[in-house]
């Protein structure tokens, strides 16, 4: 059982004791069983607009079902649904359009700025392509996402005061089929549990109450998103979390239980590269110099391991500036 599972269990009914940093916040800003209805949230919009952004890169197998889970909300709770495509070479765009989403490429979103690779770049550019007062990000590799993911995420922003960022938390199954096993009920979120949460405990312990600091499903005010830099690649979520805390404090952050999140689990080699970027971003946010050296991995060339091939994954320390400096609203 992971740390996140244990904390979720406490929220579900084991009780809270004011003995740990963040316990008061967990009682006030964490929704374990969100009860809002779509109709209630539509009424609470009070003239505010909501954009949902799906960053995508070669997600033809899942993009359609993710869009299908959100599209019934369009022209009601949701004002626009955008797929920000990062250069897919498969049928992601075709299937997204067929499902009813508007697809915007990185080039179209911000044509005057040369492209950089990575997820952080896609999310940053989506701010130029969208118009909502609230922006919801949902990963495109989700499997059978619950149709209430988006309503639950915007709930604290529409019904509360002072909240600017809403993170999600959930149980994360681990599909180990590639290793000859099956699907485990827990065990997903390996970078979160082995890298992000231990580092936050050391460097920003106040954020230890955030169950899924790297989760790709979250909502935020445009005011916040356009005022902070965006970290490159997979550092974008941890960068945004720390920036929000450092600028606005813990009470500007909330979290909502989305139940279960299933997605395409990645091999360890890719998780190593992801971890390297998360570490670089968190160190930089905490004022600790990073070497800027990429992660070198050694892969056995055969079952006997008699020789190894080196592969180095690059790491980036270059943030994108706040969008309001590029596109003042």
Curated annotation (Swiss-Prot):
This is Glucosyl-3-phosphoglycerate synthase. Involved in the biosynthesis of 6-O-methylglucose lipopolysaccarides (MGLPs). Catalyzes the transfer of the glucose moiety from UDP-alpha-D-glucose (UDP-Glc) to the position 2 of 3-phospho-D-glycerate (3-PGA) to form glucosyl-3-phosphoglycerate (GPG). To a lesser extent can also use GDP-Glc but not UDP-Gal or UDP-GlcNAc as the sugar donor. Its cofactor is Mg(2+); Mn(2+). Keywords: Glycosyltransferase, Magnesium, Manganese, Metal-binding, Transferase. NCBIfam families: PRK13915.1 (NF010496). One of its GO terms (molecular function) is metal ion binding. Transmembrane segments: none annotated. It comes from Mycolicibacterium paratuberculosis (strain ATCC BAA-968 / K-10). It catalyses: an NDP-alpha-D-glucose + (2R)-3-phosphoglycerate = (2R)-2-O-(alpha-D-glucopyranosyl)-3-phospho-glycerate + a ribonucleoside 5'-diphosphate + H(+); (2R)-3-phosphoglycerate + UDP-alpha-D-glucose = (2R)-2-O-(alpha-D-glucopyranosyl)-3-phospho-glycerate + UDP + H(+); GDP-D-glucose + (2R)-3-phosphoglycerate = (2R)-2-O-(alpha-D-glucopyranosyl)-3-phospho-glycerate + GDP + H(+).
């Amino acid at each position: 059982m992971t740390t996140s599972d244990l904390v979720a269990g406490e929220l579900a009914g084991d009780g809270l004791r004011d003995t740990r940093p963040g316990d008061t916040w967990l009682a006030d800003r964490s929704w374990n069983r969100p009860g809002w209805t779509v109709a209630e949230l539509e009424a609470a919009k009070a003239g505010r607009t909501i954009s949902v952004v799906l960053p995508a890169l070669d997600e033809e197998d899942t993009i359609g079902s993710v869009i299908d889970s959100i599209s019934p909300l369009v022209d009601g709770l949701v004002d626009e649904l955008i797929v920000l495509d990062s250069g897919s070479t498969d049928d992601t765009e075709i299937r997204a359009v067929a499902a009813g989403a508007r697809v915007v490429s990185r080039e179209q979103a911000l044509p005057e700025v040369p492209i950089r690779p990575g997820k952080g770049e896609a999310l940053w550019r989506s701010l130029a392509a969208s118009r909502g007062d609230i922006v919801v990000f949902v990963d495109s590799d989700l499997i059978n996402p619950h149709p209430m993911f988006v309503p639950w995420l915007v709930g604290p922003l529409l019904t509360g005061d002072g909240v600017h960022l809403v993170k999600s938390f959930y149980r994360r199954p681990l599909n180990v089929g590639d290793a000859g096993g099956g699907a485990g009920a827990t065990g997903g979120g390996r970078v979160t549990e082995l890298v992000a949460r231990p580092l936050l405990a050391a460097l920003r312990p106040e954020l230890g109450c955030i169950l899924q600091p790297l989760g790709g499903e979250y909502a935020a005010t445009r005011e916040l998103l356009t005022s902070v830099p965006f970290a490159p690649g997979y550092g974008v979520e941890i960068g945004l979390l720390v920036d929000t805390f450092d600028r606005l404090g813990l009470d500007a952050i909330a979290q909502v239980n989305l139940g279960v999140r299933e997605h395409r689990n990645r091999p360890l080699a890719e998780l190593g590269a992801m971890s390297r970027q998360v570490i670089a971003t968190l160190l930089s946010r905490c004022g600790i110099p990073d070497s800027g050296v990429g992660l070198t991995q050694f892969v056995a060339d055969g079952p006997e391991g008699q020789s190894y091939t080196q592969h180095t994954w690059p790491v980036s320390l270059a943030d994108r500036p706040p969008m309001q400096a590029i596109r003042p609203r």
